[in-house]
Regions:
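Membrane-embedded alpha-helical bundles of multi-pass transporters/translocases
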Residues: 2-455
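N-terminal low-complexity segments that are often proline-rich with Ser/Thr-Pro
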Residues: 457-459
Length: 459
């Protein structure tokens, strides 16, 4: 197994390069993520005005999840676990200056072959795959979803390859471009959707135009990073380098990481599956709530952990340096996420009103999404800290531990969600009020003496 070498030694202990503070790198990452998230938020604002929470919006959100399986399983999370720690140590070693490029070329070659095969299968099997993963969609929504899935697959394939670029650039401490590149992905969707709207196309046609934006934007997000990747690692050569300990180490960690990401992705599809039991608009409500919920995760947590992962990997033999970085990062995460949770729960309604309530997006939609956002916010801090612990495990080569814990999390979340959704299904939103429209299935004996009139049960 490959073991990187730290260049500096002090009193027999490897010395960390603390002259490169993770806080500065986190600010650079945060700037890129902020611009990217802002463009994503603008995209959602425009789509909400164009499509609301109706059939075309549900179809677009559901369709994006299926090829998104490829991105989430093979993309940034998996490469963070398997590729970045090894590659970061490799570029600091003195043994062979060409080896990092050869290893990186091998990984992108294998990743490209796997991604291409999955994209082709996904396009050909879009209908049965959609039926299996989203079996409860209404017929009208399902047919549109299948068409959108076929268009989107190639775009998400390009985004997987752009995650490889992100890994290369992060390891070389070039953070901004890779995190700002998704602006092009969002911009392409916005432009295509607005062009369709300007031509007075139907909602379904606007959704199809946005799907083509997903494809074009994915290609642009990948291609814009290539020049800088070649600049920082000019020795990259496509092909498979045989007999490399570093390649073997990356591959040995890749498949457990894929399993871990698969478990997390299953959680997302479980949400979609359960939402299929609910009324039209449930997919869109979950998606919009997740976008707001993920803002502090993306802006604060991802900026911190993305800057820390290469340094954790380089400093893993220096316990004091690791401890200092971990404590500093955990304090930052706690500060940002606790405040964000309180803000989302107490001020979520006016925030959603300000962001989305226009066009076909109504005040009832605002209340609906606020409730979903408030529920998500209860786990915001735990989600952020789990990412930090996960990175620490990855830096020491442990990808199986986070995968097991992710499986436990999905089991608990799925069970609780399955039980509660049938209880909360007895609530409805009517004229900006939450009313109960029936007895709770599991607790009916407790409600024998309650008034049968739902109008008398307003909350």
């Amino acid at each position: 197994m490959f073991n990187g070498r730290l260049k500096l030694v002090e009193n027999g202990e490897p010395k960390s390069d603390l002259s490169r503070p993770s806080g500065r790198n986190a600010m650079i990452v945060g700037a890129g993520i902020m611009l990217s998230r802002l463009s994503g938020l603008i995209r959602e604002l425009i789509f909400a005005g164009l499509l609301g929470t109706r059939v075309a919006a549900d179809a677009f959100k559901a369709a994006l999840q299926i090829p998104g399986l490829l991105q989430n399983i093979l993309g940034e999370g998996t490469l963070s676990a398997s590729f970045i720690p090894t590659y970061s140590r490799l570029i600091d070693a003195n043994d062979d200056k060409d080896e990092p490029g050869l290893v990186a070329g091998t990984i992108v070659t294998l990743l490209g072959l796997i991604t291409s095969a999955i994209v082709i299968i996904g396009i050909l099997a879009a209908r049965p795959m959609s039926k299996i993963l989203l079996p409860l969609l209404p017929d009208e929504t399902f047919e549109l979803t299948v068409n959108l899935v076929r268009i989107m697959w190639a775009g998400l394939g390009f985004i997987v390859l752009s995650s490889w670029c992100l890994g290369i650039l992060n390891a070389h401490r070039k953070f901004f471009l890779s995190f700002a590149a998704p602006i092009l992905w969002n911009a392409a969707q916005i432009i295509f959707a607005l062009l369709a709207w300007a031509q007075d196309w139907s909602n379904a046609s606007i959704a199809k135009a946005a799907a083509w934006g997903v494809l074009v934007g994915g290609a642009l997000q990948f291609l814009i990073q290539i020049p800088l990747v070649i600049k920082v690692s000019p020795s990259i050569k496509l092909g498979v380098k045989k007999g490399s300990d570093a390649v073997r180490e990356i591959i040995s960690k890749f498949f457990p990481a894929v399993m871990g990401r698969g478990v997390i992705q299953f959680s997302g599809f479980l949400d979609l599956f359960l939402a299929g039991f609910l009324a039209t608009g449930a997919f869109t409500a979950l998606s919009l709530a997740q976008i707001i919920y993920m803002l502090p995760i993306g802006l604060f947590v991802m900026s911190i952990i993305s800057a820390d992962l290469p340094e954790f990997s380089r400093d893993r033999d220096n316990i004091s340096a690791i401890t200092t970085r971990f404590i500093t990062s955990s304090e930052r995460i706690a500060f940002y996420l606790v405040f964000s949770s309180i803000a989302f729960i107490t001020m979520g309604e006016p925030l959603i009103d300000f962001l989305f309530e226009r066009g076909k997006f109504t005040s009832e939609d605002t209340l609906y999404i606020w409730i979903v956002l408030a529920a998500y916010s209860l786990g915001l801090y735990a989600t952020g800290m789990s990412r930090l612990y996960q990175n620490l495990c990855y830096s020491y080569g442990d990808v199986k531990g986070p995968a097991r814990l992710a499986g436990l999390r999905v089991l608990v979340a799925g069970s609780v969600g399955f039980l509660l959704m049938f209880q909360l299904d007895r609530f409805a939103i009517d004229r900006n009020a939450i009313i109960r429209i029936g007895d709770f299935p599991s607790f009916t004996p407790c409600l024998l003496y309650t008034s049968p009139s739902p109008r008398d049960r307003s909350l």
